[in-house]
Amino acid sequence: MTKTDERKPAIFLLSLGCSKNTVDSERLTAQAVASGLTFTDNVDEADIILINTCGFIKDAKQESIDETLAAIGKKEEGVVREVYVMGCLVELYRKELAEEMPEIDGLFGTRELPEVLAAIGAKYREELFDRRELLTPPHYAFLKIAEGCNRRCSFCSIPKIRGPYVSQPIEQLLREAALLQQQGVKELNLIAQDISVYGYDLYGKSALNDLTLRLSDMGFNWIRLLYAYPLNFPLEVISTMRERPNVCNYIDMPLQHINDRILKSMQRGIGRKATEQLIDDIRQKNPDIRLRTTMIAGYPGETRAEFEELLDFIRQTRFDRLGCFPYRHEEHASAYALEDTVSDEEKEKRVGELMELQEGISASLNRKLEGQTLKVLIDRIEESVAYARTEYDAPEVDNDVIIEIGDEAVEEGDFRQVMIEDSTAYELFGRISG
């Protein structure tokens, strides 16, 4: 592409961080395209670099800074004219970024979409708020049902970054979902910082189940629920999963820990007893459900005995999917006032122990699937190998089903029946049977 001053600028958009950020970038892209702007995947063909940053933990912040410095380098080389930075990192460090990187042409927070668009030569149109240009594969998308968070978890800076919890009205979400369906989306993944309290601010009660039922009626192949908080979780949605074939038997519910002292320090609002009862209730209501969770190892003051309690809990509960992260001492989180007593080396050691335990659990659970025929969604095809997921696996984080397709007529976005022949802790291997 030859750059000229007569045409509108071409944008290179780099979207970092979580799926919530992805949705923000998709909304921005749709608005910009409606104003006649074009986007390119080749930075050397761009006039403008726009980076949607993450500021959640140290590693994510560093990635955002590194990418911004690289973009500034492209500007200094004359490859691009302008560099704009938006998103979570700006919410936390706007002043510092402006002082340390004056080469940035504009800084925008998480709630400044009209301003970002104006800077790159586009116009914000309220009537296009529901429209998105997908950055995911076309067969699945994320539906952000709320913005912000009212929880005050001590390790988390999201409320400071994203502001208070604001639910999107059901009718608006249904319009957005209909547009996604028209684009060919088959799997809809419901996301927020906390889906459990969706609707309280609008309707005075949880509306998560109502929304799920309405979306189910629209005929999506799969509807998946991600990022549930254990406190105030609406159990009726678990029954809906059992009753509605297109609502996946899957819930992602980060628990973070199980020791009562640590949960209290984390300001989670729920203790061990209530957590265990909730898990029992979920599994009794829907025995086919798969439960994903996330844990933190090395929280300030975590003793070896408290960590062993967490290991025992995981051993007993046998989560279907589990991730673990070392505690990061983040200056904008309230736990920053605590002494970071566990060394980085010990944190990594504990993460390794926990994930080794989970690897054994996952391998055992996957072995039970050998010989079964499962419905899968084909995510991508590389040469003669297809990578797929079952309803029990969310995009990007869970098991892959790996299929040697040979001469089979298979396309990305297809649903197929697969006979599982072999497995590892995080992979299933099978052949197409229908």
UniProtKB/Swiss-Prot annotation:
Binding, [4Fe-4S] cluster 1: 18, 54, 88
Subcellular location: Cytoplasm
Name this polypeptide is given: Ribosomal protein uS12 methylthiotransferase RimO
Chemical reaction(s) catalysed: L-aspartate(89)-[ribosomal protein uS12]-hydrogen + (sulfur carrier)-SH + AH2 + 2 S-adenosyl-L-methionine = 3-methylsulfanyl-L-aspartate(89)-[ribosomal protein uS12]-hydrogen + (sulfur carrier)-H + 5'-deoxyadenosine + L-methionine + A + S-adenosyl-L-homocysteine + 2 H(+)
Binding site for [4Fe-4S] cluster 2: 149, 153, 156
GO function term, MF aspect, one: aspartic acid methylthiotransferase activity
Protein encoded by which gene: rimO
Main location group: cytoplasm
Functional description taken from the UniProt entry: Catalyzes the methylthiolation of an aspartic acid residue of ribosomal protein uS12.
Cofactor(s) this protein requires: [4Fe-4S] cluster
Entries under CDD domains matching the protein: Radical_SAM
Entry note: cofactor: Binds 2 [4Fe-4S] clusters. One cluster is coordinated with 3 cysteines and an exchangeable S-adenosyl-L-methionine.
Pfam families: Radical_SAM (PF04055), TRAM_2 (PF18693), UPF0004 (PF00919)
Source superkingdom: Bacteria
Family stated for the protein in its record: Belongs to the methylthiotransferase family. RimO subfamily.
InterPro entries according to UniProt: Elp3/MiaA/NifB-like_rSAM, Methylthiotransferase, Methylthiotransferase_CS, Methylthiotransferase_N, Methylthiotransferase_N_sf, NA-bd_OB-fold, Ribosomal_uS12_MeSTrfase_RimO, rSAM
GO biological process: tRNA modification
Domain annotation TRAM: ranges: 367-434
